[in-house]
């Protein structure tokens, strides 16, 4: 997180340089400075051209091609989601520790980038650093049902759903600065069977562990669907206790 920035100056610059918007109008209508000024809760994605400029001058080595900031409930504080740790296996504790070390180095470089290149962030100061890495995906349990990209809209999926997701299929490359972002055609359901391990009794799954493929997980991994899946697992557990 950072403080001591001038968001209005940043948005003025963004308004004058539309090439620095990472999400285009034909993808998200109304994704513009007017929206950002009116919304206390937003996620800005862009500054592609400024990052290209910084890379050309040797000032940006983070494997990202876009700057992302997210507003927080704390006035005057922004969360920066622009680091990326690649080419590690996050299921290996040693590699995870090395990734955390790399993350700290990236924070230093990102602060220097913001101070030097981003209008409105010339005097920005570091407010906090996450104590852990945000790991998108490692292992999944094998459930009694596995939801895949091919079956996410199947009739039986809708009938058996205990939660839904409407977020994009948002796959971040683990080896380079690339994101595959594909809108979902419509909200899709997550069947109860994806929460039930195939070979373990007395356990229900939630969050990153559910039985889905990478494409489905790229949508279902975000907060809204995870909250819904967690509630479904808790409800099922309570019903199981009630029924003995």
Region locations from a protein language model:
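Flavin (FAD/FMN)-binding glycine-rich loop and adjacent Rossmann-like elements that form
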Residues: 1-244
């Amino acid at each position: 997180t950072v403080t001591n920035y001038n968001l209005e100056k940043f948005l003025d610059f963004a308004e004058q340089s539309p090439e620095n918007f990472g999400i285009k109008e034909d993808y998200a209508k109304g994704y513009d400075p007017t929206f950002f000024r009116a919304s206390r809760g937003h996620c800005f994605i862009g500054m592609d051209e400024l990052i290209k400029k910084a890379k050309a001058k040797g000032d940006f080595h983070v494997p990202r091609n876009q700057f992302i900031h997210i507003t927080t409930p704390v006035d005057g504080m922004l969360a920066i989601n622009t680091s990326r740790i690649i080419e590690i296996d996050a299921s290996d504790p040693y590699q995870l520790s090395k990734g955390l070390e790399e993350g700290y180095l990236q924070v230093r470089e990102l602060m220097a980038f913001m101070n030097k290149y981003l209008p409105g962030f010339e005097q920005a100061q570091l407010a906090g650093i996450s104590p852990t890495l945000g790991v998108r995906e490692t292992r999944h349990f094998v459930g009694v049902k596995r939801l895949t990209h091919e079956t996410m809209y199947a009739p039986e999926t809708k009938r058996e759903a205990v939660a839904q997701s409407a977020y994009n299929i948002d796959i971040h490359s683990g080896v380079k600065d690339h994101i595959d972002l594909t809108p979902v055609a419509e909200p899709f359901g997550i069947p109860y069977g994806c929460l039930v391990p195939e070979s373990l009794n007395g356990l229900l799954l939630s969050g990153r562990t559910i039985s889905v493929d990478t494409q489905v997980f790229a949508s279902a991994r975000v907060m809204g669907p995870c909250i819904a899946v967690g509630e479904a697992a808790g409800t099922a557990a309570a019903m199981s206790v009630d029924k003995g």
